[in-house]
């Protein structure tokens, strides 16, 4: 959407200003979120007004004024056009989700990875989603295949939205929303229960690896996400495999690895799918 953003704004920004737009915008339901470089923050109102006029399905435009940060993985947003409301409905692959784009973590840029994971799940699996947010990965997996998913999140807003999304999608009993620290929840309730564990907190995966292993059955699978620096895009997956093997202390078999998305110049979010043998 970077090219689309530049095209939409070409009549309200100078050519020099237009070239400074370095990021695409995200549309989540009827909300647009745009990142604006510091050099163009003074133009944020006209940018918001123009986006609202040009994108017919949008009712709100927000400027993202901080990165995603903190234990709750939230960001600061400032309304620059339209309605000042951060909750919306988002649809993906047959599921409906209520999301709050400021109070709970959510990214539309992970839809391909969500679809991939849902396609891997087998009938009857028990899954632990350690940093599950509003339940996107969890509900899509359960909608696709009969399974049980424990969706853990530290953020009480995310956990409550997950409960609402379970009701909306008629998946009560298949997706269980648990509010708390993933390590504590696993150690107290879920030791050795999971056929599959999702670790969707790439910047802190090393810290939580032992907890993921505690929740896993013998021959279970971990989806281990990380951020990797690579001069060549095609090298990032292999580097992530090497990194996992350097921090893992168990008998592990790499199934596959892949780039999920770029997150910065020569930085990539990657995932390694690993089978763990405990015995």
Region annotations inferred by a language model:
Residues 1-279:
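SAM-dependent transferase fold signal centered on methyltransferase-like domains
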């Amino acid at each position: 959407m970077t090219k689309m953003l530049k095209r939409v704004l070409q009549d309200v920004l100078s050519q020099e200003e237009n070239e400074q737009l370095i990021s695409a915008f995200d549309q989540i339901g009827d909300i647009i979120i745009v990142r604006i470089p510091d050099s163009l923050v003074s133009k944020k109102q006209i940018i918001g007004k123009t986006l609202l006029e040009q994108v017919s399905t949008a009712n709100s435009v927000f400027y993202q004024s901080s990165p995603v940060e903190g234990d709750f993985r939230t960001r600061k947003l400032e309304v620059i056009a339209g309605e000042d409301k951060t909750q919306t409905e988002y649809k993906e692959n047959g599921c409906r989700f209520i999301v709050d784009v400021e109070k709970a973590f959510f990214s539309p840029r992970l839809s391909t990875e969500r679809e991939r994971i849902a396609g891997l799940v087998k009938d009857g699996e028990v899954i632990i989603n350690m940093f599950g947010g509003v339940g996107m990965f969890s509900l899509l997996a359960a909608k696709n295949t009969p399974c049980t998913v424990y969706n853990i999140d530290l953020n009480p807003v995310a956990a409550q939205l997950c409960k609402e999304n379970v009701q909306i999608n008629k998946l009560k009993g298949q997706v269980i929303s648990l509010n708390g620290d993933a390590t504590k929840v696993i150690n107290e309730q879920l030791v050795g229960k999971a056929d599959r564990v999702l670790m969707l907190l790439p910047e802190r995966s090393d810290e939580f690896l032992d907890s993921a292993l505690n929740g896993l059955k013998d021959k279970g699978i971990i989806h281990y996400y990380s951020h990797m620096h690579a001069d060549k895009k095609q090298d990032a997956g292999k580097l992530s495999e090497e990194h996992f093997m350097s921090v893992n202390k168990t008998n592990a078999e790499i199934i596959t690895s892949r780039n999920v998305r770029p997150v910065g110049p020569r930085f990539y979010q990657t995932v390694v799918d690993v089978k763990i043998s405990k015995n």
